[in-house]
Amino acid sequence: MATINQLVRQPRKRSVEKSDVPALQNCPQRRGVCTRVYTTTPRKPNSALRKVCRVRLTNGFEVSSYIGGEGHNLQEHSVVLIRGGRVKDLPGVRYHTVRGSLDTSGVKGRNQGRSKYGTKRPK
């Protein structure tokens, strides 16, 4: 146990919390350009073809970003907005593309949870 004198001379170190999304640099979202759009398979025990894109951000970072929802219109050189949020069964994918903003279209025919997929309200 440290004495009060020792603590006055050298206070206790605060532990620095490590960010889960370092490429965002404390911003809520970041803009970037798709360098590669591809599908990948998840870890065991799941099985699927998950849609992922590699994005070069405006701050110079290059990250993998998950494309949620059914169907998408992204290709190389598409400008996308990414947010934080990892995909548990895809190693190395720590970001999500924001649907319905910039070059990313919303999900067609979506009626529930529309705000998460950038779908306008049906008339």
Curated annotation (Swiss-Prot):
Domain of life: Bacteria
Compositional bias of kind Basic residues: 111-123
InterPro entries in alphabetical order: NA-bd_OB-fold, Ribosomal_uS12, Ribosomal_uS12_bac
Region of interest called Disordered, as start-end residue ranges on this chain: 1-22, 100-123
Biological process according to GO: translation
Keywords: Methylation, Ribonucleoprotein, Ribosomal protein, RNA-binding, rRNA-binding, tRNA-binding
GO MF: rRNA binding; structural constituent of ribosome; tRNA binding
One Pfam family in the UniProt entry: Ribosom_S12_S23
One cellular component (GO) term of this entry: small ribosomal subunit
Positions bearing 3-methylthioaspartic acid: D89
Homology family: Belongs to the universal ribosomal protein uS12 family.
Quaternary structure note: Part of the 30S ribosomal subunit. Contacts proteins S8 and S17. May interact with IF1 in the 30S initiation complex.
Function, in words: With S4 and S5 plays an important role in translational accuracy.
The protein's name in its UniProt record: Small ribosomal subunit protein uS12
Organism, as annotated: Pseudomonas putida (strain GB-1)
